[in-house]
Design a protein with these regions (language model features):
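Structural core positions within WD40/WD-like beta-propeller blades
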Residues: 73, 113-114, 152
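Acidic, small-residue rich beta-repeat scaffolds with periodic aromatic anchors
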Residues: 143-172
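Repeated scaffold domains used in trafficking and secretory/extracellular systems
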Residues: 2-30, 50-70, 95-110, 136-150
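Extracellular-facing segments of soluble proteins and assemblies that are Gly/Ser/Thr-biased and enriched
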Residues: 65-95
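A short beta-strand motif characteristic of beta-propeller blades
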Residues: 46-56, 89-95, 129-135, 170-172
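WD40 beta-propeller blade core
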Residues: 81-82, 122, 161
Length: 172
């Protein structure tokens, strides 16, 4: 079984040989803007891929990386990137939130892939298409959980939202 580690690489410079680690795959998603998040993927202690993005800064944490089937989904800045390991293969990168993607989740009963963004909660497919995306009155900074049939997000003002997993509509 291969081990995978996600590293915060705030000082990494793309297309430079003057980095602490050398990654064989680089993807800069910043579009020419200043990168606020750079995450390295290390497999079995070997640096394999590095992803950089603009938007709100993110650091690796327990909900940054999701393994679903044979693919991994990684939150980097305002993006979700999809890849597999053994050998490494990059599939796609998806701008999932206008500001920041806080985490990537999978509902255990339905298999729905959900991103918890700062401004939006979104459901996306394994092929990188957004099925629905919805927002609230304020930023979703005070909590997030998946339940059978709905995603629950709490905004900055403490308002609780329950979004149906099938369509993203607010449930009572």
């Amino acid at each position: 079984m291969q081990s995978i580690e996600i590293l915060d690489e705030p000082t990494y410079t793309f297309a430079s040989s003057d980095n602490l680690r050398r990654y064989s795959f680089e993807l800069d998603l910043s579009g020419g803007y200043r990168r606020s998040s750079v995450h390295g993927v290390v497999i079995d202690s070997q640096p394999v891929a590095v992803f950089g993005a603009c938007g709100g800064a993110t650091q690796p944490h327990s909900n940054s990386l999701l393994k679903h089937g044979d693919r991994y989904y990684l939150a980097v800045g305002s993006f979700v990137v999809c890849f597999s390991i053994g050998p490494f293969k990059h599939y796609w990168a998806l701008a999932i939130d206008p500001a920041t993607c806080f985490g990537v989740h999978c509902c255990s009963d339905s298999g729905a892939l959900i991103s918890h963004g700062e401004l939006e909660i979104s459901r996306f497919t394994e092929s990188g298409n957004i099925l629905w995306s919805t927002s609230g009155a304020d930023i979703f900074s005070e909590g997030f959980a998946l339940h059978a049939g709905f995603a629950e997000a709490i905004d900055f003002n403490g308002k609780v939202y329950r979004f149906g997993l099938s369509d993203g509509r607010v449930r009572a």
